[in-house]
Structure formats: structure tokens, C-alpha cells
Amino acid sequence: MKNDLSLFNIINYRTKFINDLKYQVKNNPKKYQLETAKEVESLFIQMLLKSMRNSLTQDNLLDSNQSRFYTEIYDQKISKEIAKRGIGLTHIILQQIQKINNNFYL
């Protein structure tokens, strides 16, 4: 049960981070556009890793709540590291954010 609560806290932290980022973008959109694009790329990579891992480990003997908990944390850290170097999505996402902001301010 403790691991479930810890995972819940991690999810809440990530949600709070995204909500804080939304607030910052509203107040100073140009400053936080790149950070937002990087975070979206990181979330995409994390979802990609999770989907790949789920397709491989469905009937694993070592599959347990604890292993899923640590795997989730590992995937989150790996996705952040991969996103630092980028997979090419940040630039595309940034263009979309800028296009939305330009249309919003017209």
C-alpha cells in the first residue's frame, strides 16, 4: 500500500508541475514555451516507454506492484534524460505552441 501511495504522490507531483507550468505560460508565454515543449516531449517519451514495456512484460513472473512502481520511476527518469537530448519533437511542439499563441493574441 505504501508504494501505491508513493506512486500517487509522484503522479500528483507531475500534475502539479504541469499545472504550475500552465500558469507560468499564461503569465509569460514567450519565456516558458521551450520548457513546455520539452516537458510535452518528455511525457510523450514516457508514454512510449510505458507502452513498449507493457507489451513485453505482461506475463512476467517478477511482475508485482513493487516492480511496476520502480519501473514507472525508472521510465520517468529515462524519459527526462532522453528528452534533454531530444528526439526531434521539441522543435515541432514549440512551433505549434507559437502558432497557437500568435493566433490567440491576434
Curated annotation (Swiss-Prot):
A Pfam family of this chain: Rod-binding
GO terms classed as biological process: bacterial-type flagellum organization
Signal peptide segment: none
InterPro entries: Flagellar_prot_FlgJ_N
Key words of the record: Bacterial flagellum biogenesis
Domain of life, per lineage: Bacteria
Family as reported in the entry's similarity comment: Belongs to the FlgJ family.
Note: This protein is shorter than other FlgJ proteins and lacks the muramidase domain. It may be degenerating and may no longer be functional.
Protein name stated in the entry: Putative flagellar protein FlgJ homolog
Organism encoding this protein: Buchnera aphidicola subsp. Schizaphis graminum (strain Sg)
